[in-house]
Regions:
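C-terminal functional extensions of proteins
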Residues: 179-221
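Generic structural signal for well-ordered, non-membrane alpha-helical segments
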Residues: 22-30, 42-46, 50, 69, ...
Length: 221
């Protein structure tokens, strides 16, 4: 149906002229994000990570909720360049990491589906996602951590560190949800002894977390 304002003609023009080149789409997307977002609170290297996070969720007001330490980008990139593993709480986070951006063909680990995890979770009285972190301990020292699904995993990580577990080089902590997400991110944001980037409040998720890791892995947009 063609309306009096020529809406159908405009739709045809859009369908004919839409961008098809992937690189051009990325460049235009990042330009729009930078034009519409207030990134003034962030150092340039952190701002680059935040742009990627916004690109993953489509919400430019995410800048109001992102909290990051001054040295998180440097710490994460140094660790990844040295070959540190990336430890993920969920397979969706792991799947979202772009391997070609990794500087040292870094190992990506997610132990959620390890056969030992259900028994661990039952014994510990916690979620499987949190219990799976027990299997991180041998490689946690100097690793890059990506938690984008379960608040219980972020709480468990902070408890492990407080109990003397090795410290990761950097943490991306952005679990999503209505129960525990805001609280766990607030706990991380209050830590002066860790390098991190987090999203306060209920927002977060696997896509945002993986996008942050991809940005930390390489400065290339």
């Amino acid at each position: 149906m063609i309306g009096p304002d020529g809406a159908a003609d405009r739709l045809t023009d859009i369908m004919t002229e839409y961008l098809r080149d992937g690189a051009s789409i990325y460049r235009r997307s990042f330009a729009i994000i930078r034009a519409e977002s207030d990134l003034s609170a962030f150092a340039p290297d952190v701002a680059g990570v935040v742009v990627r996070m916004i690109h993953a969720c489509g919400q430019t007001d995410l800048t109001r909720d992102v909290v990051a330490t001054e040295g998180v980008v440097r710490a994460a990139r140094n660790a990844l360049t040295d070959g540190a593993p990336i430890l993920c709480d969920a397979t969706m986070v792991a799947s979202g990491i772009t391997r070609r951006r990794l500087p040292a063909d870094n190992e990506i680990r997610c132990h959620l589906h390890d056969p030992a995890v259900p028994e661990l979770a039952e014994r510990m009285g916690t979620t499987r996602t949190a219990a799976a972190l027990e299997l991180w301990k041998p490689v946690l020292d100097g690793a890059v951590v990506a938690i984008g699904n379960a608040p219980t995993a972020l709480f468990a990580l902070l408890e492990m560190i407080d109990a003397g577990a090795p410290r990761p080089a950097a943490i991306v902590g952005a679990p999503v949800g209505f129960v525990g997400a805001a609280e766990s991110c607030a706990e991380l944001a209050a830590r002066a002894d860790l390098e991190f980037i987090t999203v306060t409040g209920r927002r977060g998720g696997s896509a945002i977390t993986a996008a942050a890791i991809n940005a930390l892995a390489s400065p290339e947009e």
